[in-house]
UniProtKB/Swiss-Prot annotation:
Gene expressing this chain: X
Name listed for the protein in its UniProt record: Protein X
Family: Belongs to the orthohepadnavirus protein X family.
General function of this protein: Multifunctional protein that plays a role in silencing host antiviral defenses and promoting viral transcription. Does not seem to be essential for HBV infection. May be directly involved in development of cirrhosis and liver cancer (hepatocellular carcinoma). Most of cytosolic activities involve modulation of cytosolic calcium. The effect on apoptosis is controversial depending on the cell types in which the studies have been conducted. May induce apoptosis by localizing in mitochondria and causing loss of mitochondrial membrane potential.
BP GO terms, sorted: DNA-templated transcription; symbiont-mediated activation of host NF-kappaB cascade; symbiont-mediated arrest of host cell cycle during G2/M transition; viral genome replication
Top-level taxon: Viruses
Keywords associated with the record: Activation of host NF-kappa-B by virus, Activator, Apoptosis, Host cytoplasm, Host G2/M cell cycle arrest by virus, Host mitochondrion, Host nucleus, Host-virus interaction, Modulation of host cell cycle by virus, Transcription, Transcription regulation
Region entry Mitochondrial targeting sequence, spans: 68-117
Length: 154
């Protein structure tokens, strides 16, 4: 069964922040383009970084109050909506890395919501794991085959 998560991009750090749906009633609200979201309070984030929650495949930083720096999740149809169809996400992330005009933060949030999480949650198919790296910290995984360094199979 797929974990249900809130998804929000933090434009100041250029990272994708995730929150387990069960945490919406805890912690302080976090305002953003998608409305008001909740971030877990310190008491809602256990010392083991949520290992007991069985949110399969999420990096350790997914449970930090700042949100994760990399997102690993199970997606449908071998990621055809994000990788194979039009190569949209790698191009967008590459442009953002170079500081060039690219998809806006709001559009990128909608892209994840509509193209990725819709397939993942509604279809429930579990074929491959992918990691999307929008920012950087010691948890990120960048070992993708050429030509794209913005995602990797796990």
């Amino acid at each position: 069964m797929a974990a249900r998560l809130y998804c929000q991009l933090d434009p100041s750090r250029d990272v994708l922040c995730l929150r387990p749906v069960g945490a919406e009633s805890r912690g302080r609200p976090l305002s953003g383009p998608l409305g008001t979201l909740s971030s877990p309070s310190p008491s809602a984030v256990p010392a083991d970084h949520g290992a007991h929650l069985s949110l399969r495949g999420l990096p350790v930083c997914a449970f930090s109050s700042a949100g994760p720096c990399a997102l690993r999740f199970t997606s449908a149809r071998c990621m055809e909506t994000t990788v194979n169809a039009h190569q949209i996400l790698p191009k967008v992330l590459h442009k953002r890395t170079l500081g060039l005009p690219a998809m806006s933060t709001t559009d990128l949030e909608a892209y994840f919501k509509d193209s990725v999480f819709k397939d993942w949650e509604e279809l429930g198919e579990e074929i491959r794991l992918k990691v999307f790296v929008l920012g950087g910290c010691r948890h990120k995984l960048v070992c993708a085959p050429a030509p794209c360094n913005f995602f990797t199979s796990a």
